[in-house]
A protein has these predicted regions:
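Bacterial Sec signal peptide processing site at the extreme N-terminus
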Residues: 18-41
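Short solvent-exposed coil/turn linkers within tandem alpha-helical repeat scaffolds
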Residues: 63-71, 100-115, 189-193
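Acidic, low-complexity proline/glycine/alanine-rich linker and hinge segments
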Residues: 117-161, 200-205, 230-238
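A beta-hairpin/wing motif
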Residues: 163-178, 201, 213-242
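A short, well-structured alpha-helical segment
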Residues: 165, 176-212
Length: 242
């Protein structure tokens, strides 16, 4: 089961929405198996920017011996993040593709698909990076709020919740005259990449009031703040392959 997230939406240049579920559970793992504990420690190392520890752990463990669970898929995901951080894009792609092959039903597989999509754009679209930089500048300038009708909550990444890791993602996106969101992109996030995918998937489902006279802003920017809350621990040891 994918747990609902606790998050705050900050409209850039506008009022802050009050926090939701700010309490944090202690960083403990009761009855954790070795794969889950190893994956959780890797996420905590990544939170601190320590990809060397993630990569050292990856070199020591035998993932083939791990069951095909969310913990295993999430470990592969953070390996891919670190490969991107090291600018080893070929290794990142292969890691994400392996995740899709071996854990196609996992939450982490959705994030892997998002990263592969972005990597394809970076490789094939010469104007992509300039477009992202333009979106970043627009986000910093703020935006006139369109009236929201439906905001689907972002889902908290399961292993990040277990590891009690918080963070944020800033999403810049268009809103069509009829109120659909269009082409959301991440312009800032911390820890890098960790909440990007879930933030994008949520914003794609959002709906705004229509703008029949065309007087409202076509671009919006929202900062999603993710705060781990005391909730049922997600099942990271359930099978994630058919």
């Amino acid at each position: 089961m994918r747990p609902a997230s606790s998050f705050i939406l900050l409209l850039l240049g506008l009022a802050m929405v009050p926090p939701v579920g700010c309490s944090s559970a202690p960083r403990t793992l009761a009855d954790a198996g070795a794969p889950l504990e190893t994956a959780t420690n890797a996420y905590r190392a990544y939170e601190q920017g320590d990809c060397s520890q993630v990569e050292a752990t990856a070199g020591k463990v035998s993932l083939e011996a791990w069951p095909a669970t969310e913990a295993r898929s999430s470990f592969l995901l953070v390996e891919g993040f670190c490969a991107e951080h090291a600018q080893d894009i070929d290794r990142a792609r292969e890691t994400y593709r392996r995740l899709l092959r071996e854990g196609p039903l996992s939450f982490a597989s959705d994030d892997a698909r998002e990263r592969l999509r972005v990597l394809r754009l970076q490789e094939n679209d010469p104007g992509y990076e300039d477009w992202i930089e333009g979106a970043r500048r627009r986000a910093l300038q703020g935006s006139t709020d369109r009236t929201p009708i439906e905001r689907t909550p972002a889902t908290y990444p399961p292993l990040a919740q277990v590891a009690q890791i918080g963070g944020y993602a800033v999403v810049e996106f268009g809103v069509t005259p009829r109120g659909d969101t269009d082409a959301p992109v991440i312009v800032d996030s911390n820890p890098p990449l960790l909440f990007d995918g879930t933030a994008l998937r949520a914003v794609r489902e959002w709906r705004y009031a229509s703008d029949a006279d065309g007087t409202q802003s076509e671009r919006q920017a929202i900062r999603m703040v993710f705060e781990p809350e005391e909730a049922d621990t997600p099942d990271l040891e359930a099978p994630v392959s058919p």
